[in-house]
Regions:
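Conserved beta-ketoacyl condensing-enzyme motif
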Residues: 7, 23, 28-162, 190-199, ...
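ACP-dependent fatty acid/polyketide chain-elongation machinery
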Residues: 1-66, 244-256, 351-365, 409-413
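Glycine-/small-residue-rich "gating" segment that lines the acyl/pantetheine channel
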Residues: 123-130, 171, 175, 184, ...
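A glycine- and small-aliphatic-rich helix-loop capping segment at beta-alpha/alpha-beta transitions
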Residues: 21-28, 112-126, 176-179, 199-212, ...
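Active-site-adjacent elements of ketosynthase-type condensing enzymes
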Residues: 42-52, 109-113, 192-219, 261-281, ...
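Condensing-enzyme catalytic core mediating Claisen C-C bond formation in acyl metabolism
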Residues: 4-8, 35, 213-290, 299, ...
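Active-site-proximal alpha-helical scaffold in enzymes
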Residues: 77-89, 139-143, 147-191, 229-251, ...
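Flexible, low-complexity linker/loop segments at domain and module junctions
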Residues: 1-7, 94-97, 290-296, 326-327, ...
């Protein structure tokens, strides 16, 4: 019998707030977290807006002596993991420790640290480089620091698959539990790349929105006037547990993770395939893995980046995958409010998808003022929708054509 995997905790940090409740309330209100960049002087950049995390104090989660040893993306990962662990009411005991693992992803890692230390090198030579530079910046140290924090000695890894990274981390974690390698996984992703090089690099690709005078309206998935994505930052972490383990300890269960799909476009380094093939196959793979029919899906948290190509091709892929049901399923892009968290997007959006099941509420797609004729499905525009959600899909598509889909279901004994 296949071991079942359930979600017992959700930890979220995004431009909408620090903590799961703050994020959920903002999502339900249809509030934008996008504003003018404050972290550096972006006056010379074509894109001068982003979704920065506000009011985050690392000292609430991390000892002062350790903060300087970590890039902000690691700090976000620790804080989101703490929120998730607290919600799960989980303590990793010495007996549990070898069976508890961590899988935290990032698309870019410690960009701010890399830029700072490069400046130190140029200005002062190699002796100015911090001894904490490497462990503060490399991607797997988010998982490493979280495992140290909670004493998790089981499987420990990190994915770096662009915007699909944390969805892969969550799906791979579920597979580890299913095959008996772990009973508990702390899984998700974290990102903090709103830096001169980060913004400048994406802007050079002409991937970013330049609606600088109306930041809160810049991220507008599926809208005719969309002009690129808006960078965001933060973290999304889930606590995954084997069902019987969770039941024995009396855990509250948010939802069950029943399906996981992976695919590649094998088409282009940044653009999705023109026929939506990779997206179709990844959704079909998640449905098949779950043993669920397309008509069973009540909600899709779309990748929905607000770029000209992604949104129309994701729409096409949903139509191909879901057939007649495509027009009946509720779809929303919460990136309209959070911006694009890059490697952390899948973790944040998996958490949002789980909360939609838990609360029976579908967050809206804001700024959908003039729907693109090629994007003609139900994107839950402007306002939340109260609706029972039994099965929901979360899509994540990344540069290099790497795709992931997670399928969650309301827990039923």
């Amino acid at each position: 019998m296949r071991r079942r995997v359930v979600v017992t905790g959700v930890g979220l940090i995004s431009p909408l707030g620090v903590g799961t409740r703050a994020n959920w309330d903002a999502l339900c209100e249809g509030r934008s977290g996008i504003a003018t960049i404050t972290r550096f002087d972006a006056a010379q950049f074509s894109a001068r807006i982003a979704g920065e995390v506000k009011d985050f104090d690392p000292l609430q989660f991390i000892d002062k002596k350790d903060v300087k040893k970590m890039d902000v993306f690691i700090q976000f990962a620790i804080a989101a993991s703490q929120f998730a662990m607290d919600e799960a009411r989980l303590t990793i005991t010495p007996d549990l420790s070898p069976r508890a693992g961590v899988f935290i992803a990032s698309g870019i890692g410690g960009f701010a640290t890399i830029e700072r230390e490069h400046k130190a090198l140029i200005e002062g030579g190699p002796r100015r480089i911090s001894p904490f530079f490497i462990p503060a910046a490399i991607i797997n140290l988010a998982a490493g620091q979280v495992s140290i924090r909670f004493g998790a000695k089981g499987p420990n890894s990190a994915t770096c698959t662009a915007c699909s990274a944390s969805a892969h981390a969550i799906g791979d974690s579920a597979e580890l539990i299913r095959r008996g390698a772990a009973d508990v996984m702390i899984a998700g992703g974290s990102e903090s790349a709103i830096t001169p090089m980060g913004v400048g690099g994406f802007a050079a690709m002409r991937a970013l929105s330049t609606r600088n005078e109306e930041p809160e309206k810049a991220s507008r998935p599926f809208d005719r006037d969309r002009d690129g994505f808006v960078m965001g930052e933060g973290a999304g972490v889930l606590i995954l547990e084997e069902l019987e383990f969770a039941r024995r300890r009396g855990a509250s269960i948010y939802a069950e993770l029943v399906g996981y799909g992976m695919s590649a476009d094998a088409f282009h380094i940044t653009a999705p395939s023109e026929d939506g093939d990779g997206a179709v196959r990844v959704m079909n793979a998640a449905l098949a893995n779950a043993g669920v029919e397309p008509a069973d899906i009540d909600y899709i948290n779309a990748h929905g980046t607000s770029t000209p190509y992604n949104d129309k091709l994701e729409t096409l892929a949903i139509k191909k995958c879901f057939g007649d049901h495509a027009g009946r399923v509720a779809i929303s892009s919460t990136k309209s409010m959070t911006g694009h968290l890059l490697g952390a997007a899948g973790g944040l959006e998996a958490g949002i998808t789980v909360l939609a099941i838990t609360h029976g509420v579908i967050p809206p797609t804001i700024n959908l003022d003039n729907p693109d004729p090629e994007c003609d499905l139900d994107y839950v525009p402007h306002r939340k929708r109260e609706k029972p959600v039994t099965c929901a899909l979360s899509n994540s598509f990344g540069f290099g054509g790497t795709n992931a889909a997670l399928l969650f279901k309301r827990y039923d004994e």
